[in-house]
Amino acid sequence: MDRCKENCVSRPVKTTVPFGPKRVLVTEQIPSQNLGSASSGQAQRVLCPSNSQRVPSQAQKLGAGQKPAPKQLPAASVPRPVSRLNNPQKNEQPAASGNDSEKEQASLQKTEDTKKRQWTLEDFDIGRPLGKGKFGNVYLARERQSKFILALKVLFKTQLEKANVEHQLRREVEIQSHLRHPNILRLYGYFHDATRVYLILEYAPLGTVYRELQKLSKFDEQRTATYITELANALSYCHSKRVIHRDIKPENLLLGSNGELKIADFGWSVHAPSSRRTTMCGTLDYLPPEMIEGRMHDEKVDLWSLGVLCYEFLVGMPPFEAHTYQETYRRISRVEFTFPDFVTEGARDLISRLLKHNASQRLTLAEVLEHPWIKANSSKPPTGHTSKEPTSKSS
């Protein structure tokens, strides 16, 4: 597929890298020689393996009278689910009118039932494919009892094992299932059978930010500032939970039904009890100097990526893009980039203060949100957003 990534799994779950873009992959260590160049002579963006979920624009709900297409998944042995849906947050489902006490008791009972629920493929009507990737597919789906519309990511165990990426899926499930923020894609639960792993995900009907960027070439200042505001809010939440994303890029950002930005693909994310790591990961265009140079890094890597993203939104290409990996590497290490004339002074100031070689000199997320250019151009971010999730059957 083209470019685009709560529980700790009770058993080792064979996992996957979501549907990544068809870009050149790089390994954990970037060789100092023979990095190669784009055969076409055009600049290429370089991608490390990641769990990118690419969900194209689709309708939020199935049309009136429209039934989901028959299951399009290959036949498999009887599902043997081992995991359950995460406990829904209180009041995530709208309550009907009636006796408050009885409704509260029913809600509590439903919550307990959901906690004990073990999902199988038979619980879902499977609709059209939303995306295809190296390790599986994403389908539009509907939970049969609640009629809740969602995205079902289906990953093939054999392909995950062959690529040795099970650990990335475990990490994605562990981290994403614990996060609750309006600008972070929800992972409601997961289950597996003999051949496949299934992730029950929030459906983002407007597709990826990357597709929007391709369609429009670049964004105006108002849209860019609004996206950066939403992203900064979401990253502040992640960092408060000691989670570093490490792979922020347009392919990993989805759009909800109201156009709100949602971070997806936590395959390269980490819980950071030490807050310092040395692993190389993510997309080369977005990697900060400390990561490509193999130095220790912390949550400030996400600040660098925020600056790169802001630049790409406004200009239509990343600031360090080059014809070869070596040149991109060199530009990042030296922080060599220029602004087109149409980029305003306020935007230049914000980006330049995020793209600092010394991580300690980068703006904090709080400072990003208070930056004059952001405050002057960002529309009010979505508020009061609560996500719903499928409910369990009555016993």
Swiss-Prot record:
There is a cross-link at K249 (Glycyl lysine isopeptide (Lys-Gly) (interchain with G-Cter in SUMO2)). Residues 124-374 form the Protein kinase domain. The keyword ATP-binding applies. Disulfide bonds: none annotated. Residues 1-114, 376-395 are annotated as: Disordered. PROSITE patterns: PROTEIN_KINASE_ATP (PS00107), PROTEIN_KINASE_DOM (PS50011), PROTEIN_KINASE_ST (PS00108). This is Aurora kinase A. It comes from Mus musculus (Mouse).
